[in-house]
Amino acid sequence: MGASSSSALARLGLPARPWPRWLGVAALGLAAVALGTVAWRRAWPRRRRRLQQVGTVAKLWIYPVKSCKGVPVSEAECTAMGLRSGNLRDRFWLVIKEDGHMVTARQEPRLVLISIIYENNCLIFRAPDMDQLVLPSKQPSSNKLHNCRIFGLDIKGRDCGNEAAKWFTNFLKTEAYRLVQFETNMKGRTSRKLLPTLDQNFQVAYPDYCPLLIMTDASLVDLNTRMEKKMKMENFRPNIVVTGCDAFEEDTWDELLIGSVEVKKVMACPRCILTTVDPDTGVIDRKQPLDTLKSYRLCDPSERELYKLSPLFGIYYSVEKIGSLRVGDPVYRMV
């Protein structure tokens, strides 16, 4: 029955005749087919993509405190904000000055001497000539909330207490410092503010730029053939180290599948003076390996606005699909 007939019956106070039942079923069926077709078309590009193995996961590292030693793990959960093992999160803790500005090994090279063990839901900090510091992995909500500053952007941090502040201050011996922790209910620093020229959308806590840094052991071997003093992977602080590929093959990787995790390239990693800090002594060199890297790893002139004169070593990734990964997992390039 047409719309005019239905409205006429309504004016007479009579009920409108119902649509035939078969017509409603048919309409629902057509809608389901249409939605299924749309979903299939959207999924089709992913389904038809080929997986090409490019290497194998050799190492996984979580760096709980920015600029302190990394914690090697055999497996990890990969969240949108980076690697996680239990309550141990990548760069969820940060040393700050009293005014909230971040402190890294660029200013305090001896931070790289602080090691961290995760045990019984606690972080155990150890450093040369210091008693160990034991902190719970979650701070009381009654602790002060700090306004922190990282590369010109604001972010919150929960104070980790006076004992932690005293421990870091006594070890570094320069000025008063405090330790803060990022909480998952806090707002991270967004990629749109960190990297406004790039078209990606993610958040990070206290990393420099991105949730993940991937490197290959072959690229480090290549660098060391040019170096008088050999560098360690710890100089470069990657989250995922890949073996079984050629040097700098990672420059060509866009989207990767590792375990059940899918990641997408954001940019190459522009290297800074932090790489010149010896991870074993905490002494800053200020020249190597930067000078050597600059001799053959500068960006194309067309990318100078993004990278300036920083040499490129390693690749930053965002997390497209969360999941888990482990040492020994094949690394697939999605092509």
Swiss-Prot record:
It is found in: Mitochondrion outer membrane; Peroxisome. It is a peripheral membrane protein. The modification N6-acetyllysine is found at residue 156. One of its GO terms (cellular component) is mitochondrion. Its EC number is 1.7.-.-. InterPro entries: MoCF_Sase_C, MOCOS_middle, Pyrv_Knase-like_insert_dom_sf. Residues 1-35 form a transit peptide. It holds the Pfam family MOSC_N. Its cofactor is Mo-molybdopterin. It catalyses: N(omega)-hydroxy-L-arginine + 2 Fe(II)-[cytochrome b5] + 2 H(+) = L-arginine + 2 Fe(III)-[cytochrome b5] + H2O. Binds 1 Mo-molybdopterin (Mo-MPT) cofactor per subunit. One of its GO terms (molecular function) is oxidoreductase activity, acting on other nitrogenous compounds as donors. There is a cross-link at residues 59, 138, 144, 156, 166, 173, 187, 287, 294 (Glycyl lysine isopeptide (Lys-Gly) (interchain with G-Cter in ubiquitin)). Keywords: Acetylation, Isopeptide bond, Membrane, Mitochondrion, Mitochondrion outer membrane, Molybdenum, Oxidoreductase, Peroxisome, Transit peptide, Ubl conjugation. Residues 188-334 form the MOSC domain. Ubiquitinated by PRKN during mitophagy, leading to its degradation and enhancement of mitophagy. Deubiquitinated by USP30. One of its GO terms (biological process) is nitric oxide biosynthetic process. Component of a complex composed of cytochrome b5, NADH-cytochrome b5 reductase (CYB5R3) and MTARC2. Catalyzes the reduction of N-oxygenated molecules, acting as a counterpart of cytochrome P450 and flavin-containing monooxygenases in metabolic cycles. As a component of prodrug-converting system, reduces a multitude of N-hydroxylated prodrugs particularly amidoximes, leading to increased drug bioavailability. May be involved in mitochondrial N(omega)-hydroxy-L-arginine (NOHA) reduction, regulating endogenous nitric oxide levels and biosynthesis. This is Mitochondrial amidoxime reducing component 2. The lineage of its organism: Eukaryota, Metazoa, Chordata, Craniata, Vertebrata.
